[in-house]
Amino acid sequence: MLREIRRVFMHYEAGSYDVIVVGAGHAGCEAALAAARMGASTLVITLNLDMIAFMPCNPSIGGPAKGIVVREIDALGGEMGKNIDKTHIQMRMLNTGKGPAVRALRAQADKFLYQQEMKKTLENQENLTLLQGKVEKLIVEDGVCKGVITHTGARYYAKAVVITTGTFLRGEIIIGDIKYSSGPNNQQPSIKLSEHLEELGFELVRFKTGTPPRVNSHTIDYSKTEIQPGDDVPRAFSYETKQYITDQLPCWLTYTTEETHRIIDENLHLSPMYSGMIKGTGPRYCPSIEDKIVRFHDKPRHQIFLEPEGRHTQEVYVQGLSTSLPEHIQRQMLATIPGLEKAQLMRAGYAIEYDAIVPTQLWPTLETKVVQRLYTAGQINGTSGYEEAAGQGLIAGINAACKALGKEELILSRSEAYIGVLIDDLVTKGTNEPYRLLTSRAEYRLLLRHDNADLRLTEIGYKIGLISQERYEKFVAKKEAIEAEKKRLKSYIIKPTPQVQQLIRDVGGSELKDGIRAADLLKRPEMTYEHIQMIAPAEQPIDPEVAEQVEIQIKYEGYIEKSLQQVEKLKKMENKKIPEDIDYDAITGLATEARQKLKQVRPLSIAQASRISGVNPADISILLVYLEQGKIARVSNE
């Protein structure tokens, strides 16, 4: 009791800011940079300044859906794309043999250089202050967040607060039968803040994630593995990157064996997942090796990728072997994998359990419904992945700054961005496991492509103040060049000359009978924009990004048009707003489950209400009638 009283008197006023960001992982970095760049004085408080933007799991950025999120972050004015472009050791475009909707960029990171560069960016950002400390409580008055209190008793005040604590909330590391309080990579956890959130009325859930062992590169026999080089073509996530890294490092592919599976099978009783020690729910789309062996028992082998963690370290990440089995079992497993028979274990794999908030407690702005002017982003919201965290962090930072500066907040729709899909899924449907973004979650994925993120979002980034005038002018010029070239190809008639017919035969197409518009010829599956340029050349050289857009927009014109028509229908539903003070108990005819879910989520529109699981079309019809009657009643009263 005396200790508590003494701590009350030890509190001191430490400063006031527009925005405070708690945590400096991938979500925290984007949130802080966005707020500061929008003109909000911003304080970042993090447990360890040496671990800013740390990658505790896979040393990579991007991949299916996730890579598109990184492009969206860049198109809006965020930092992740620029940072990985400066620090990667390898980059590859995935799914190049498939349609543009599922193509995605993936980069292997030099994880240590990535941290250094991101820290440097934060240190040099105007309006941004970095502080090492542990936030233990929020200052909440009348349901409004006014600031934070650190473990040293410092009270920092703000007009908005963003919490981006990752997997640190009551974090516990588990290896075999060993369990101890810890954040990722044996960092100190955040316990009191988690308890404080419960005191404020937040509903928390327990999630789990894991990481594989790291081994010494000098002890790997790479002759028994398959090399996985990066692309020869220069690649970049950021639209502003002009200098490309050409000195790439390869990754390597190997496989588990029947002996690996036997060892795992015989020691499943030692796995915390199956012994009952782990209570948290793990990620469905990133299962542990134990889980894979149990779920896919008939599969003779599983892929293992050996990924260097950086240029100046010998640590190699054994991707595909995520495990929390005891350390001695991990050593036995490694010895059965081709190329790893003599590999030295440098770090054991582990599972980590942590607290997350139930994300239906958030508005689409990522402000919490429980406490006003408090925002959350990243794994605290129940997601997995650096990219998902960064996307949320960017939106939370933008909206915290908007709230602090008295501006209108930003909500991205499902048809505008994968970030919009991600946030809408979280706040509307919630999640009972660590959420991973997939292309299949986006109903408008043909519109949400890797190649057109700038066309979708740069205008928005410019309006909110994250895109410079110079960049915006280049963007406008690109848009105009795309439209001009499309217009040219739609009016240019290609005649069936011998040269044209020969080219068409060479690519396996049917010869022309009459003249044809260049755009119509380009729609043929065997034809590319390069082919068209050979027979209908432009007067001036066409920028490769412009050429790519022209080809995709013309080739997929019909499909894109259908998607846009669906979006217009959705907009009508989105425009049917639901009043914040609506009383769902007063609406007769709603199913009990629908009533409960509507009261919990409190959707902002009919479209959002229709996406809530447990709310059926019949419930939506009843809700629409009720809203119409309310309008009629208001008009009559007036």
UniProtKB/Swiss-Prot annotation:
Keywords: Cytoplasm, FAD, Flavoprotein, NAD, tRNA processing. GO terms for biological process: tRNA methylation; tRNA wobble uridine modification. It comes from the Bacteria. Its cofactor is FAD. One of its GO terms (molecular function) is flavin adenine dinucleotide binding. It is found in: Cytoplasm. InterPro entries: FAD/NAD-bd_sf, GIDA_C_N, MnmG, MnmG-rel, MnmG-rel_CS, MnmG_C, MnmG_C_subdom, MnmG_C_subdom_sf. The keyword Cytoplasm applies. GO terms for cellular component: cytosol. FAD binds at G23, A24, G25, H26, A27, G28, V135, S190, Q379. NAD(+) binds at residues 282-296. Homodimer. Heterotetramer of two MnmE and two MnmG subunits. NAD-binding protein involved in the addition of a carboxymethylaminomethyl (cmnm) group at the wobble position (U34) of certain tRNAs, forming tRNA-cmnm(5)s(2)U34. Belongs to the MnmG family. This is tRNA uridine 5-carboxymethylaminomethyl modification enzyme MnmG. It comes from Anoxybacillus flavithermus (strain DSM 21510 / WK1). The gene is mnmG.
